UniProtKB/Swiss-Prot annotation:
SUPFAM superfamilies: Anticodon-binding domain of a subclass of class I aminoacyl-tRNA synthetases, Nucleotidylyl transferase, ValRS/IleRS/LeuRS editing domain. It comes from Pyrococcus furiosus (strain ATCC 43587 / DSM 3638 / JCM 8422 / Vc1). Monomer. Signal peptide: none annotated. This is Isoleucine--tRNA ligase. One of its GO terms (cellular component) is cytoplasm. It is an enzyme of class 6 (ligase). ATP binds at residue 628. Catalyzes the attachment of isoleucine to tRNA(Ile). As IleRS can inadvertently accommodate and process structurally similar amino acids such as valine, to avoid such errors it has two additional distinct tRNA(Ile)-dependent editing activities. One activity is designated as 'pretransfer' editing and involves the hydrolysis of activated Val-AMP. The other activity is designated 'posttransfer' editing and involves deacylation of mischarged Val-tRNA(Ile).
Length: 1066
């Protein structure tokens, strides 16, 4: 049976701990899974959060969305695959471990601690953070298989990566190539395009104009501009656009005449920037410059430049390129194929060497600045060029520049040999598969994704690091390669292992090999340096592993099949793949969403997921990014501690559309907490009365109950609510769902329905009208708790356990089915009519306030003036509600006689008609009523024509003095403010009832407790109160009201000139 609530007040902390304990002790999570094990499959793929530290509000938002979707699908009957995942390799962890160990370079890693120890430290760091993050996710009420997460560091996961890369190799989509790529000199590794997107930050760099002497021409120069002076030692050409107009400009430099070649369109800007005047002496097309030779300005400092000049025809010449623009610079571009993507491409076309005199740490390996870090060489190079007379002007520029996504070091462009996935060959396939098979939420993100795919280059997947999936590429001394696809294949091909520099040949038998491997290397571990020890033999050639590891984005890119253990475990893959739904933050559109599709199309020729949703970032209240430096970070634990898990969860799904950025607001959090408090109060009220009357919905004969219009209305609303919430979730328009729930709880259920039925709940005995209200409330909770359970799992569980479980026999709210709307209960017309009734009540209350008549004092009559048929029907059908809520003896539809005065609106007439304003104003004074009735008129006054509208008039209405009016959308409410003795007596009785009830509350009396009331008051009050003594006794549960000295618990109420005493009857 229903009991009185354990907590009278909503205390999230206590309540949620209690529910956590219940779930744990009753093993509810496992029971929920067991219940749905035969349902249709739903593969929810958890995008693995990176284990570099504790979760933040963005991570929490992400997991809350995921948990809500999982709970929703489970209630729909799906057997949801809900394995959490963790991204555990990569640079971010290496950087953290390096900092902890005080290491600064790769050399220090190898010499001070050793690769094996470093990798062990990375593993420990990752596993420790995994444990911390798991507890934080559990704290949010997230239900996933926490005992069985997928981890990118597990052998079977790494083997999935090897399988995928082997598939790429077999398709001709994996190859080694020299390319110019972003390079992090601190981490000493290449970075892929998608790692750099979003990592451009403002920084100041040099901005210099330099002149290259034209060979064989005295005082004639090619004028170039650059922000990377450090790349000038590697300059091999100057690029011009074939179709642009170029000019030779004569300039006067302190009495010395020089000739500069640059783009015609940039002459004024460049000369103005440099601060010199010039005269154009010759004009020509860019293509005419092709082949023009210049003298390298650092030839002596970098002797290799002389070798290149002699060996390559196009070195130190003007070449043609379409990438040259007129937006900045001089129209002539300093070209270094070893340090620029476009430079590299045009260099290939002209047969230029790829020259990059810079090592992995970003230091020069030769020439004048050997051993100097390139960015530190900038000022030295500028000063040197000044001394040599080649510097025209040096300045500074603030621009967006790419930084390492983890260590934040400015990147450099550098040519290196790397391994690439040839995504360029499958781009069109990715776009086609995506457009045909993937549903995007919101839909416009699909276009952004497709454009990203079109703009992407080949995927550089090699990293010159340690903590990552080792590239499964073995290479012979003569350059032949073989890609290993599994642990089994590696063992089969292995002929020897190398341990501490010693070669150990392996026996031929597979089982014997395994024994030796385990004895010498330990159990299978597909990380470095374990796999580095293997020497394999293919085509009669011994091969050793390429030392690189795989881009960490590849780890998560294969998650949809690697998390299922494929290809080691084919059964799960065949049952579940592809994923039905994924959801991640906005930055993942060009990262994880992309890396998955690229890897999947390469491996399986199709996409790995069927539906994808994107959410925004969490910002502070002002819209700023949360950061330590700004001191505006709010931790998830802080929100849970202050407001509770349910409040936090609901707020994050209510505050904004999921694809927009969420500006976190404590006011918003408090607003949601108040909503849940309102829900709790409705529950406490319902459960308290139901428990007193031993209400049992199973014993109710529904067909015998006479439901009132408000009962039918709330049942109609709650059934429509099912559609609204479900539609909001299905379309990922989550705010539609949460705001519909919020409005239903606050406006429909609490502020309206409960307000309408309170008096019915007070009636004693088995009153059928009260029973109808109980049953309606119970049915509303039956639906509402199911709808809210995925959003607020704790409060719904607590309420369910008391008012639902005794009658359903089902152990948890989360084991219930998602509700289906009862169309027979939906009455759209009644809902429309009730909406008007609420508006009329609001307007009527405002009118009473104008008249300064408290709601407790009844009024004689209220008139509703309207032309709307729905309003008329509503007033007729729901008249009893209006009478009760507006405390009126009579509510009727009718018209009120009133006098209308129309005056000119001089604020409008004067400025518009100027000199004719007097004529117009006179006409309005005489004929204004005609204009008011028609809305607009064309008139002729003294031979002049005017167009007049209601904007030109001010309308004053004079209604009878005993009425006060207020408009509502659909009409107007008139309240008759005449107060008779009878009305005064009734109002005073209500005033006293309210105060007695307040005193009962202060004494914490039970609803059923009986009292005796004693009242000391004026003679006039006593006479008025005696007219309504029965009403006072009934409403206050008093067995007697006596007019004498107040006794017991006594309170003086000056505003009604009375002392009231109450005594509980034992």
């Amino acid at each position: 049976m229903i009991k009185e609530p354990e907590f009278r007040d909503y205390t999230p902390g206590k309540l949620e701990e209690k529910i956590e304990q219940f779930w744990k002790e009753s093993n509810i999570y496992q029971k929920v899974k067991e219940l749905r094990k035969n349902g249709p499959k739903y593969y929810f793929l958890d995008g693995p959060p990176y284990v570099s530290g504790a979760i933040h509000l963005g991570t929490a938002w992400n997991k809350i969305i995921k948990d809500m979707i999982i709970r929703f699908r489970t209630m729909q009957g799906y057997n949801v695959w809900r394995q959490p995942g963790y991204d555990m390799h990569g640079l971010p962890i290496e950087v953290k471990v390096e900092q902890a160990l005080g290491l600064k370079t790769k050399k220090e890693i190898e010499e001070k601690i050793g690769v094996e120890n470093f990798i062990q430290k990375c593993k420990e760091f990752a596993l420790n953070n995994l444990r911390i993050m798991t507890e934080q996710f559990k704290m949010l009420g997230v239900w996933m298989d926490w005992d069985n997460p997928y981890m990118t560091i597990k052998n079977e996961y790494i083997e999935s990566a090897w399988f995928t890369l082997k598939r790429a190799w077999e398709k001709g989509l994996l190859e080694k190539d020299k390319r110019v790529l972003h390079w992090c000199p601190r981490c000493e590794t290449a970075l892929a395009e998608h790692e750099v997107r979003g990592e451009y930050k403002l920084r100041k760099d040099p901005s210099i104009y330099v002149k290259f002497p034209v060979e064989g021409k005295e005082n004639e120069y090619l004028l170039i501009w650059t922000t990377t002076p450090w790349t000038l030692p590697a300059n091999l050409a100057v690029s011009a656009h074939p179709d642009y107009d170029y000019v030779k400009v004569r300039v006067d430099l302190n009495g010395r005449e020089e000739y500069w070649i640059l783009a015609k369109a940039l002459v004024e800007k460049v000369l103005g920037d440099i601060g010199v005047k010039g005269e154009v002496v010759e004009e020509f097309k860019g293509k005419e410059l092709e082949g023009l030779r210049y003298v390298h300005i650092l030839m002596d400092e970098y002797p290799r430049q002389k070798e290149f000049r002699e060996k390559y025809e196009w070195v130190h010449r003007v070449i043609l390129a379409d990438f040259v623009t007129l937006e900045e610079g001089t129209g002539l571009v300093h070209t270094a194929p070893g340090h620029g993507e476009e430079d590299f491409e045009v260099g290939q076309k002209y047969g230029l060497p790829v020259y990059s005199p810079v090592d992995d740490q970003g230091k020069y390996v030769e020439g004048k600045w050997k051993g100097v870090y390139v960015k530190e060489a900038d000022p030295q190079i500028i000063e040197h060029l000044k001394e040599k007379g080649y510097l025209v002007k040096a300045g500074e520029i603030e621009h967006k520049y790419p930084h390492c996504w983890r260590c934040k070091t400015p990147l450099i462009f550098r040519a290196t040999d790397q391994w690439f996935l040839k995504v360029s060959k499958v781009k069109e396939k990715i776009i086609k598969e995506n457009d045909e098979k993937v549903t995007w939420y919101p839909e416009w993100v699909k276009i952004r994704f497709d454009n990203g795919v079109r703009d992407s280059g080949d995927w550089v997947i090699s990293r010159q690091r340690y903590w990552g999936i080792p590239l499964p590429i073995w290479q012979s001394e003569d350059g032949e390669i073989y890609v290993v696809g599994s642990w089994k294949e590696l063992v089969e091909l292995a002929v020897a292992i190398e341990v501490n520099g010693e070669r150990i040949d392996l026996p031929e038998s597979y089982e014997e090999k395994l024994k030796v491997i385990e004895e010498k290397l330990g159990p299978e571990d597909l990380h470095r340096p374990y796999v580095d020890a293997f020497i394999i033999k293919v085509n009669g050639k011994e091969m050793r592993r390429v030392k690189d590891v795989v881009d960490v984005w590849f780890d998560s890119g294969i998650a949809s099949w690697a998390s299922l253990g494929y290809p080691r475990n084919k059964e799960l893959f065949e049952k579940l793949w592809p994923a039905d739904f994924i959801v991640e933050g906005e930055d993942q559109v060009t990262k994880w969403f992309y890396s998955q599709q690229a890897a999947s199309v390469i491996a399986f020729d199709t996409v790995p997921y069927r539906a994808v949703a994107m959410h925004g970032y969490v910002l502070d209240e002002k819209g700023d990014k949360m950061s330590k430096s700004l001191g505006n970070i709010i931790r998830p634990e802080e929100v849970v501690e202050k407001a509770g898990r349910d409040t936090f969860r609901f707020y994050m799904l209510w505050a904004t559309n999921p694809w927009e950025n969420l500006k976190f607001s404590w006011k918003g959090v408090e607003q949601v907490r108040r909503m849940l408090n309102i829900l709790w109060n409705v529950y406490v009220l319902s459960a308290t009365y139901m428990s007193l009357d031993n209400f049992d919905p199973r014993n109710v004969k529904v067909e015998e109950l006479e439901f009132r219009e408000e009962d039918k209305w709330i049942l109609s609303r709650v059934n429509n609510l099912i559609k609204e919430v479900e539609n909001g979730i299905e379309t990922f328009y989550l705010t539609k769902a949460t705001r519909a729930l919020y409005n239903f709880v606050v406006e429909d259920l609490s502020r309206w329905y409960v307000r309408l039925i309170r008096k019915r709940l007070w009636v004693e005995g088995d009153d059928p009208d009260k029973l109808a209200a109980y049953y309606t409330l119970w049915k509303v909770f039956d639906v509402l708790l199911r709808l809210m359970a995925p959003f607020t799992p704790y409060i719904t569980e607590e309420i369910y356990q008391n008012i639902m479980r005794p009658f359903t026999g089902i152990e948890s709210v989360h084991m219930l089915d998602w509700p289906k709307p009862d169309e027979s209960a939906v009455d759209e017309e009644l809902e429309r009519e009730m909406e008007f009734i609420r508006r009329i009540v609001e307007a009527g209350s405002a009118a009473r306030q104008k008249a300064k008549i408290k709601l407790r004092y009844p009024v004689r009559k209220i008139i509703i003036e309207t032309q709307d048929d729905t309003v008329k029907k509503a007033v007729e059908r729901l008249n009893y509600i209006l009478r009760d809520q507006l405390n009126a003896k009579e509510v009727v539809v009718g018209n009120v006689e009133r006098e209308i005065t129309v005056k000119p609106n001089f604020a409008k007439v004067g400025p518009e008609f100027k000199g004719d304003a007097r004529l117009v104003a006179k006409w309005i004074s005489e004929h204004g009523l005609e204009l008011y009735e028609k809305g607009e008129v064309d008139v002729e006054i003294e031979g002049k024509k005017f167009h007049l509208t209601r904007e030109h008039i001010i309308v004053e209405e004079n209604i009878p003095d005993f009425l006060v009016a207020e408009d509502f959308e659909g009409g107007r409410v008139y309240v008759d403010k005449t107060l008779t003795r009878e009305l005064l007596a009734e109002g005073l009785a209500r005033e006293f009832v309210r105060r007695i009830q307040e005193m009962r509350k202060r004494l914490d009396l039970d609803v059923n407790d009986r009292i005796v009331v004693t009242i000391e008051t004026t003679e006039e009050n006593r006479e008025l109160l005696q007219e309504n003594l029965e009403y006072i006794m009934r409403e206050t549960r008093a067995i007697e009201v006596r007019f004498e000295e107040a006794k017991g618990y006594v309170v003086e109420w000056p505003e009604v000139q009375a002392k009231i005493g109450i005594e509980k009857i034992e």
